[in-house]
Amino acid sequence: MATAVLSPMTIPGLHTAPSKEDLEKAALAYNLLHDDKDQPEIPPAHLKEITAIIVSHNVQEKFGIHLVHGHLQVDQGKVMHGTAMSSLRGCWTRPTDISGLDVGNMHGHILALSSNGEFQAYEYRQGAPPLMSPNDNAFVVALRAYLQKHCLGSLIGLQVLDEDKDKQLQEFVLGDNNGAVMLDAEDTKITQSYRVTGYVVETNESGVTELKGKETHAPTIRETHQVFTDGKPLPDEKSLVNALRADGVID
């Protein structure tokens, strides 16, 4: 039987560090995304099929999937970029000036299919791009083919996992274009969640392997997952922590 040969693949932010132009394109792509409230639920049948694709390529420690969505409009010259927090276990992703970023130390965190049928990062995080093996590339090709076949490119994206992949995380949107913060659920006062946005393959105690929701939107005391900032920017982590505390998210 002939062995399939994959054509060379270079996805900025996944295989190589992004250029300034790549980051500008990422911001444009982000601005076209639907809010999560306007996205349908991912059908369980597709979660089951994608689980099989992930497991068959043995990439469950490296990749998950994400509900494709956005929350704000990114201004020209900026890109959605996430950095680890120092005072809380979490990551703050916000519009960040491209000119001040170290492009060699950032990677695509969430990627969606673009109009040309290729994966494109629309959110970035700290850290160099992952090392991609031929098997990893084969998985990306297989996932792309599945999403295209079932017209899921605007609903399901590829997520590059990090050290938080085993944690239960809660996302809160910050008002006034301050981005969003992802926190360890053990560190918040919020016990409810209402929308799964990130999925990771796990095997439960019964031996069942499936995509489980590990990132969720959770309501604050205002019954929304948005943290209000009264029209004020959040210039630093201290101001973010104060806003989270004021809205009853943390002690």
Across the structure, where does each feature detected by a protein language model lie?
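Short, low-complexity, charged amphipathic interaction modules
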Residues: 44-61, 143, 150-152
